[in-house]
Amino acid sequence: MNIISPSILAADFGNLNKEIERISEAQWVHIDVMDGHFVPNISFGLPIVSAVRKLTAQVLDVHLMISNPLTYAERFVKAGADFVVFHMESDDDPKEVIRAVRNAGAKVGAAIKPGTPVEVLYDVMDSLDLALIMTVEPGFGGQSFLYDTEPKIRALRTFCNENGLNVPIQVDG
C-alpha cells in the first residue's frame, strides 16, 4: 500500500487552516522540523505541530532534522505527533531515541541522508514503524530527485523481506 504524506514545508502559515483543508484527502501530513544545525535551514517546531494537530485528525508524520532528537522527542509527541522520525546521523543513540518515542506513546521512524549507507538502518529495523530514505539533501524544499538513492530503497526492501520485517519505507524528496 502506498501512502502520500504531503509536506507543509511550503504552506502559507497565515492560512494554515485552509492549507490543511487543501490536503484533507491525504491520510498523513508530513511536518519537516529543521534546527539550523543538523541542516542549514530553520523551519518550525512544537507550536506548528500543535496547531496542525488541532486542525486535523490526519496522521502527523513529524520528521526531525535536528541535532539532538532525544531532547525533543517526547515534546513532539505531546504536541500531537503520531510518528516521530529522527535521523540516524544525529548526535543521539538511535536505540535511546526509539525507546523515548515509544515511551511517549508514538510510533517511530529512522531516516538517512542520501550520502549515508543504507546498512546503518539494519540494526534498528526490527524496532521501527517506518524507515525514511532521503532522495534529496535535507534542509531545503524544491530540490531534484537524486536517482542514485534508488538502489538504497531496493536494498532496504530486500533486507526487510529477507528478515520477515513489514516496515514501511518512506521516500522523502
Predicted feature locations:
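Conserved beta-strand segments that form the floor/walls of ligand-binding pockets within enzyme
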Residues: 3, 107, 111, 132-135, ...
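A short, flexible beta-alpha/helix-coil linker loop
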Residues: 35-36, 136-140
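Short, glycine/charged-rich beta-strand-loop motifs at protein surfaces that mediate ligand recognition
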Residues: 141-146, 170
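Conserved N-terminal beta1-alpha1 strand-loop-helix module at the mouth
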Residues: 1-85, 91-93, 100-103, 107-108, ...
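Short acidic loop-to-helix transition motifs that present clustered carboxylates
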Residues: 115-117
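Conserved Lys-Pro-Asp/Glu-containing loop-to-beta segment of HAD-superfamily phosphomonoesterases
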Residues: 166-173
